[in-house]
Regions:
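Active-site histidine-anchored catalytic micro-motif
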Residues: 1-143
Length: 143
């Protein structure tokens, strides 16, 4: 007799946890990207204008709001704890962490050492602040 191997919709992991740490990606400043201040925009606000596919949920969580050059041990521990809580949730399929460029590789190495394998944990950053994006799109569309 064949068993039903389908899973119900309620058991499918469909949530993306977006953890904000600050950095240039969450920065504000002039449209040119020169003279910005890192870590000013909340993770929730970085989602503005992003189309989320039907059936998917993005759950933002602000862990820290700082320039990544200022990250220390306590910040890494707080991030690891937030990741652990999200990874333990069966609805969470993956984690995306917005971060600054200065300490991105140290954060990636630390998380690789302390988090369990299984679900993807992706770090992303930017070389220009979020406030420069509109000007970038305008220049790109005229190219």
């Amino acid at each position: 007799m064949r068993q039903n191997t389908r899973t119900s919709a309620s058991t499918v992991a469909n949530t993306l946890a977006l953890l904000g740490m600050g950095g240039t990606i969450a920065g504000t400043g002039s449209a040119s990207g020169v003279g910005y201040q890192a870590g000013q925009i909340a993770a929730q606000d970085l989602l503005g204008g992003i189309a989320v596919p039907t059936g998917c949920v993005v759950r933002p969580q602000q862990v820290r709001q700082l320039d990544s050059k200022d990250i220390g041990d306590g910040d890494w521990l707080a991030l690891a704890q937030a990741c652990g809580q999200q990874l333990a949730d069966p609805q969470v399929a993956a984690i995306v962490i917005t971060h600054g460029t200065d300490t991105l590789e140290e954060t990636a190495w630390f998380l690789q050492c302390v988090l369990p394998a299984g679900k993807p944990v992706v770090l992303t950053c930017a070389m220009r602040p979020a406030s420069a994006w509109a000007a970038f799109c305008t220049r790109l569309s005229t190219a």
